[in-house]
Amino acid sequence: MGASEELEYLKSLVSQLNGKIAAIEAKAKGSPSPTPAQQLRTILIGPPGAGKGTQAPKIRDEFCVCHLATGDMLREQVQQKTPLGIEAKKIMDAGGLVSDDIMVGIIKDQLENNKSCKNGFVLDGFPRTIPQAQKLDGMLAERKEKIDSVVQLLIDDQLLISRITGRLVHPASGRSYHKEFNPPKKRNVDDVTGEPLIQRSDDNVETLTKRLRTFHSQTGPVVDYYKVKGLWHGIDAAQSPSVVWENLRSIFVSKK
């Protein structure tokens, strides 16, 4: 973590602590604790293995918003053979990258047709570039909406590699577990469905090192874009999932 990034993280940490102090003081005085905002529109940024798959469902459930994981949404559109899915499949079959316009269109489709998005959303996996961030802002502006927070999960690459090489996934739902840090209740079996878990073929050191290098090169400018807007918050994702969650929640509650 560079000096400037560490400074920004410490500022964000102070903000989180102030929110916790306010909540404790209110409780001590017998006043009601701060409650979540009625609308939450947040972006969760973090490299593979940082804990997005663990934390995003908690945000969804706590704040009654939808979890928009762009990879899952794209696969769903392709499987359902929607107009956007058909167009995306043609591009992917030709070896191309799905355009920013299609990805923003898929997000827009969810916001318009997914009832669980009525209170807002947590966006996971998008945007990855400044043009994508700008197109997302434009689409939301047309809906008279805007992003209200961007949270980056900060963690050392070596710790990430150890996390990911032990990761287990439920293919149908995308639920993720870890052999050591977040094991399923029954070994190699999904807690909800009882179906078998798998380890992704690309969850190996060589592939992960390349993915992390790409992530860092892409994410830096996007993070700076949101820092300028005053929306960025950094959280130490090396902490236990429960501590990370409390820090996340304090950010969203303080936005009320």
UniProtKB/Swiss-Prot annotation:
<feature type="binding site">
    <location>
        <position position="211"/>
    </location>
    <ligand>
        <name>AMP</name>
    </ligand>
</feature>
<feature type="region of interest" description="NMP">
    <location>
        <begin position="69"/>
        <end position="98"/>
    </location>
</feature>
<feature type="binding site">
    <location>
        <begin position="125"/>
        <end position="128"/>
    </location>
    <ligand>
        <name>AMP</name>
    </ligand>
</feature>
<dbReference type="GO" id="GO:0046034">
    <property type="term" value="P:ATP metabolic process"/>
</dbReference>
<comment type="subunit">
    <text>Monomer.</text>
</comment>
<dbReference type="GO" id="GO:0046033">
    <property type="term" value="P:AMP metabolic process"/>
</dbReference>
<keyword id="KW-0496">Mitochondrion</keyword>
<keyword id="KW-0963">Cytoplasm</keyword>
<protein>
    <recommendedName>
        <fullName>Adenylate kinase</fullName>
        <ecNumber>2.7.4.3</ecNumber>
    </recommendedName>
</protein>
<dbReference type="GO" id="GO:0005758">
    <property type="term" value="C:mitochondrial intermembrane space"/>
</dbReference>
<dbReference type="Pfam" id="PF00406">
    <property type="entry name" value="ADK"/>
</dbReference>
<feature type="binding site">
    <location>
        <position position="70"/>
    </location>
    <ligand>
        <name>AMP</name>
    </ligand>
</feature>
<dbReference type="InterPro" id="IPR007862">
    <property type="entry name" value="Adenylate_kinase_lid-dom"/>
</dbReference>
<dbReference type="InterPro" id="IPR027417">
    <property type="entry name" value="P-loop_NTPase"/>
</dbReference>
<feature type="binding site">
    <location>
        <position position="239"/>
    </location>
    <ligand>
        <name>ATP</name>
    </ligand>
</feature>
<dbReference type="InterPro" id="IPR000850">
    <property type="entry name" value="Adenylat/UMP-CMP_kin"/>
</dbReference>
<feature type="binding site">
    <location>
        <position position="200"/>
    </location>
    <ligand>
        <name>AMP</name>
    </ligand>
</feature>
<keyword id="KW-0808">Transferase</keyword>
<dbReference type="GO" id="GO:0006172">
    <property type="term" value="P:ADP biosynthetic process"/>
</dbReference>
<feature type="binding site">
    <location>
        <begin position="176"/>
        <end position="177"/>
    </location>
    <ligand>
        <name>ATP</name>
    </ligand>
</feature>
<dbReference type="InterPro" id="IPR028587">
    <property type="entry name" value="AK2"/>
</dbReference>
<dbReference type="GO" id="GO:0004017">
    <property type="term" value="F:adenylate kinase activity"/>
</dbReference>
<feature type="binding site">
    <location>
        <begin position="96"/>
        <end position="98"/>
    </location>
    <ligand>
        <name>AMP</name>
    </ligand>
</feature>
<feature type="binding site">
    <location>
        <position position="132"/>
    </location>
    <ligand>
        <name>AMP</name>
    </ligand>
</feature>
<dbReference type="GO" id="GO:0005524">
    <property type="term" value="F:ATP binding"/>
</dbReference>
<dbReference type="InterPro" id="IPR033690">
    <property type="entry name" value="Adenylat_kinase_CS"/>
</dbReference>
<keyword id="KW-0418">Kinase</keyword>
<comment type="similarity">
    <text>Belongs to the adenylate kinase family. AK2 subfamily.</text>
</comment>
<comment type="function">
    <text>Catalyzes the reversible transfer of the terminal phosphate group between ATP and AMP. Plays an important role in cellular energy homeostasis and in adenine nucleotide metabolism. Adenylate kinase activity is critical for regulation of the phosphate utilization and the AMP de novo biosynthesis pathways.</text>
</comment>
<keyword id="KW-0547">Nucleotide-binding</keyword>
<dbReference type="Pfam" id="PF05191">
    <property type="entry name" value="ADK_lid"/>
</dbReference>
<keyword id="KW-0067">ATP-binding</keyword>
<dbReference type="InterPro" id="IPR006259">
    <property type="entry name" value="Adenyl_kin_sub"/>
</dbReference>
<feature type="binding site">
    <location>
        <position position="75"/>
    </location>
    <ligand>
        <name>AMP</name>
    </ligand>
</feature>
<feature type="binding site">
    <location>
        <position position="167"/>
    </location>
    <ligand>
        <name>ATP</name>
    </ligand>
</feature>
<feature type="binding site">
    <location>
        <begin position="49"/>
        <end position="54"/>
    </location>
    <ligand>
        <name>ATP</name>
    </ligand>
</feature>
<dbReference type="GO" id="GO:0005829">
    <property type="term" value="C:cytosol"/>
</dbReference>
<feature type="region of interest" description="LID">
    <location>
        <begin position="166"/>
        <end position="203"/>
    </location>
</feature>
